[in-house]
Amino acid sequence: MNPQIRNPMERMYRDTFYDNFENEPILYGRSYTWLCYEVKIKRGRSNLLWDTGVFRGPVLPKRQSNHRQEVYFRFENHAEMCFLSWFCGNRLPANRRFQITWFVSWNPCLPCVVKVTKFLAEHPNVTLTISAARLYYYRDRDWRWVLLRLHKAGARVKIMDYEDFAYCWENFVCNEGQPFMPWYKFDDNYASLHRTLKEILRNPMEAMYPHIFYFHFKNLLKACGRNESWLCFTMEVTKHHSAVFRKRGVFRNQVDPETHCHAERCFLSWFCDDILSPNTNYEVTWYTSWSPCPECAGEVAEFLARHSNVNLTIFTARLCYFWDTDYQEGLCSLSQEGASVKIMGYKDFVSCWKNFVYSDDEPFKPWKGLQTNFRLLKRRLREILQ
């Protein structure tokens, strides 16, 4: 690979930033992706800055009559691929946890997403947040699927807001001491793209990848670095005590600076908008990586109080801040409104693995301490609810 492409730049010129990061939803003539990255190493509760830089690459492979241009436009020279090649080439230790943030002018293409998905699966010690200035061909079904695949792979996908642009301007642009100046319709463009991405990601996923399940559903008593919640659900429409319709899926936190939408809220929003009918009875089961926070527990309890036709059972892998009285009261409020709250045991993990994980027919492999932690968490939950 060309070393001039593989090695990052420190900054870009002001005109380059304004021209390539303009957040107009439909924009022509920008055939390059610019990627500003920030890599941090997690150490305890602190994130230590490790490196920053800028990559540039073509949006899509193109045929060029000039051989040198043809080489440059190859897929491996996309900005995302340049970053992965550079990052993996540093031979970083597997026992370190890395937090990567990309600020990109365009969201990644499908071939890049395939590589990013594989990279995340092979590096469970890495988390990736992608803040995009624009969405590439977002009206096309295949490109919407690209965003869903990133989301499903565990990457956090969001639209760049004012704070993101100002941060990029300060850290990745030769700004000569000048402040970032938003352009005409900046806020309107952000709102439009934000709504579009939220709509794309609002529907449940079919399943998750094995490395995500093993990382996020491991029933540790102290689970550092699990900063988001995953929720697997089954929903049955019942008539005369028999199921006549079934649906299942997976939700995860949406990275939303306005609402910080937890997985429970994602489910309620989807369920109320697309499914709920007052004359139908529902049996809903959740398998969650974390028990609900006080705010989500309160919303779910209020929902159950208003909808007596919904019966909810919650199996949780871990108890979130179980020593905190607000979290304890949240669990109690769920129980008081009729929700059955339980700790996930071995059979529940196996059931999740079979129904919500792309397992390729591989069996579930229990981790050391699963049964011991289950008993401890079960006893703790019983003490909270009694």
UniProtKB/Swiss-Prot annotation:
Changing residue 337 to K: Resistant to HIV-1 Vif and abolishes Vif binding. GO terms for biological process: clearance of foreign intracellular DNA; cytidine to uridine editing; defense response to virus; DNA cytosine deamination; innate immune response; negative regulation of single stranded viral RNA replication via double stranded DNA intermediate. Keywords: Antiviral defense, Cytoplasm, Hydrolase, Immunity, Innate immunity, Metal-binding, Repeat, Zinc. It is an enzyme of class 3 (hydrolase). (Microbial infection) Antiviral activity is neutralized by the HIV-1 virion infectivity factor (Vif), that prevents its incorporation into progeny virions by both inhibiting its translation and/or by inducing its ubiquitination and subsequent degradation by the 26S proteasome. CDD domains: cytidine_deaminase. One of its GO terms (cellular component) is P-body. Its cofactor is Zn(2+). It catalyses: a 2'-deoxycytidine in single-stranded DNA + H2O + H(+) = a 2'-deoxyuridine in single-stranded DNA + NH4(+). Changing residue 337 to A: Resistant to HIV-1 Vif and reduces Vif binding. Pfam families: NAD2. PROSITE patterns: CYT_DCMP_DEAMINASES_1, CYT_DCMP_DEAMINASES_2. InterPro entries: APOBEC/CMP_deaminase_Zn-bd, APOBEC_Cyt_Deaminase, CMP_dCMP_dom, Cytidine_deaminase-like. GO terms for molecular function: cytidine deaminase activity; RNA binding; zinc ion binding. Its main location: cytoplasm. The keyword NADP does not apply. Residues 29-145, 187-334 form the CMP/dCMP-type deaminase domain. Zn(2+) 2 binds at residues 262, 293, 296. Belongs to the cytidine and deoxycytidylate deaminase family. DNA deaminase (cytidine deaminase) which acts as an inhibitor of retrovirus replication and retrotransposon mobility via deaminase-dependent and -independent mechanisms. Exhibits antiviral activity against HIV-1. After the penetration of retroviral nucleocapsids into target cells of infection and the initiation of reverse transcription, it can induce the conversion of cytosine to uracil in the minus-sense single-strand viral DNA, leading to G-to-A hypermutations in the subsequent plus-strand viral DNA. (Microbial infection) Enhances hepatitis B virus/HBV replication by excluding restriction factors APOBEC3F and APOBEC3G from HBV capsids. The CMP/dCMP deaminase domain 1 mediates RNA binding, RNA-dependent oligomerization and virion incorporation whereas the CMP/dCMP deaminase domain 2 confers deoxycytidine deaminase activity and substrate sequence specificity. PANTHER family: DNA DC-DU-EDITING ENZYME APOBEC-3D, MRNA EDITING ENZYME. It is one of seven related genes or pseudogenes found in a cluster, thought to result from gene duplication, on chromosome 22. This is DNA dC->dU-editing enzyme APOBEC-3D. The gene is APOBEC3D.
